[in-house]
Amino acid sequence: MEPAVRGVAGVLVPVAFFAAGAAVGGRAGVAIASVWVAIAGLYCLANFWHCRETHCAVTGPGWTLAAVLGFAAALAPGTALSWYRVNVETMVFVVILAAGYGLEYVVAARTGRRAMGQAGQHAQDC
């Protein structure tokens, strides 16, 4: 899974999911976009638990909650969540991404480390 969320693939895969969701549109489109947001969120939750990367403290729960809201919008009857569509989910994804990496930048500037916690407390393979 990791190659799909890092590097060039980490840009192309979300773009593909969001583009597919936008092409389909409506409830199905937001469900498609929410699949990627859920994958990214759950990956970041696991990564934070394992490696303690600072941005994952924000992106993990943020994206997971955004995906839950996306699936709720796709499944909810009526128009209560009709405002939450692919364009909104994409903006939420980018804002959470910026907040996570912004926090990581601040932590790294202050501590010299991208990971939270004491030096050496995270896994060797991170």
Describe the role of every protein-language-model region.
Residues L42-E53, E104-A109:
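C-terminal ends of transmembrane helices
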Residues M1-G29:
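Membrane-helix boundary elements
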Residues L69-M91:
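Membrane-helix boundary connector in multi-pass membrane proteins
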Residues A74, V95-G120:
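Membrane-water interface at the C-terminal end of transmembrane alpha helices
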Residues A20-V24, N47, A72-A80:
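Juxtamembrane "helix-exit" motif on the non-cytosolic side of transmembrane helices
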Residues G26-A38, V86-V94:
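Structural signature of hydrophobic alpha-helical transmembrane segments
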Residues W36-A46, V95-G102:
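Alpha-helical transmembrane segments and their membrane-interface exit regions
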Residues T54-L65:
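Cytoplasmic-side transmembrane-helix entry/capping segments in multi-pass membrane proteins
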